């Protein structure tokens, strides 16, 4: 980090923070000096967080066995604890929050930033509502890191992200409708009948950051292939740019690899990141979820 004072102060590297809902490999956070806040979850009477989280395979195995976890949002005090040591050193902080359409974490962190700036007007904190989830939020974070490495200031980085956030596209499918029913996304009748006749829903995250069912198809392979068709309909001016594509999954890596292969075959894109969906989003989407994230003209 450059020294404070004069022109150098405005160009010093800033801290990027986010939520564990970005579903990036933890090694990425460490390598790129990113702090993340953990949305805790409770399963079988035990609350899990950053220090004691379950391995993904165990988490999903318990869900398949009937365990029904619940999640909580980041609170303002947690955000302050993460930011304060850096702010006291004179660093600027850019927080990229989990979609406000899916969690109250954005409002909690926005409140925390306002309270800290009231106490210390010299603190520079910017909170951006990503309107993204899972590796869509992860892609949002990666873009911020890319801009920071290119020498952009915190303000410039935040402005770019605000302008382009709706170009971060999310499409996905689930294998078990009952988890969507639990979250209020589909009716009980739809879940029961859909399961009986092997119906798989296709969903996306809309311009308000909400999770919205779009269509349904019969059969798992068709639902996975439909994700790439949905991508094709959204690429627009991004077609041919071969931007990175991210894929997250609820403990079904072979299905994620199948989607990755379809993307490679159709677009020649080789820069594809695959990672497991963390417990916070996995609680609501369930095992067997596959999500595809990419840059496009519209969500």
Residue ranges of predicted features:
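Generic alpha-helical hydrophobic packing signal
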Residues: 15, 80, 84, 121-124, ...
